[in-house]
């Protein structure tokens, strides 16, 4: 099955209250997801959005995943292979930040054939604007 996933994370303060939003599109249908955490960072919320989107898939899929986070897109397309090879350490020999989320995302990604796409945030991209609103709703619902 072919699926489009749009993801976004948001944070009020960094760290601070954060939220994530997801839009899944498949077979002419759409499903939205969102949530939040009281104390987090924007990067953690970007990762959580991708994790939650992939967790929603019931079987292996052909996925086009769209994000406005270069951290997420480059992490999955470029950096993760080196991190794994180096025992989850970066080029400075420091432990990779958010390693537990990267590991979870890597495990989920291994189930699917994923094409990672970067889109410019806050630029009138309809789906990106929607998941941004969902991420902010995740923050609002914390209070």
UniProtKB/Swiss-Prot annotation:
GO terms for cellular component: cytoplasm. Keywords: Cytoplasm, Endonuclease, Hydrolase, Magnesium, Metal-binding, Nuclease. GO terms for molecular function: magnesium ion binding; nucleic acid binding; RNA-DNA hybrid ribonuclease activity. The keyword Cytoplasm applies. Residues 1-140 form the RNase H type-1 domain. Mg(2+) 1 binds at residues 8, 46, 68. InterPro entries: RNase_H (IPR050092), RNaseH-like_sf (IPR012337), RNaseH_domain (IPR002156), RNaseH_sf (IPR036397), RNaseHI (IPR022892). Monomer. This is Ribonuclease H.
């Amino acid at each position: 099955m072919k699926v489009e996933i749009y993801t976004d994370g948001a944070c009020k303060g960094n760290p601070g209250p954060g939220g994530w939003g997801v839009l899944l599109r498949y077979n002419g249908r759409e499903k939205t997801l969102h949530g939040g955490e009281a104390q987090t960072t924007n990067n953690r919320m970007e990762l959580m959005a991708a994790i939650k989107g992939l967790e929603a898939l019931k079987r292996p899929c052909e996925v086009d995943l769209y994000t406005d986070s270069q951290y997420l897109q480059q992490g999955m397309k470029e950096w993760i292979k080196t991190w794994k090879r180096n025992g989850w350490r970066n080029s400075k020999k420091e432990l990779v930040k958010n390693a537990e989320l990267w590991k979870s995302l890597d495990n989920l990604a291994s189930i699917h054939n994923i094409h990672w796409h970067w889109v410019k945030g806050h630029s009138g991209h309809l789906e990106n604007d929607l998941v941004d609103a969902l991420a902010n709703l995740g923050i609002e619902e914390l209070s």
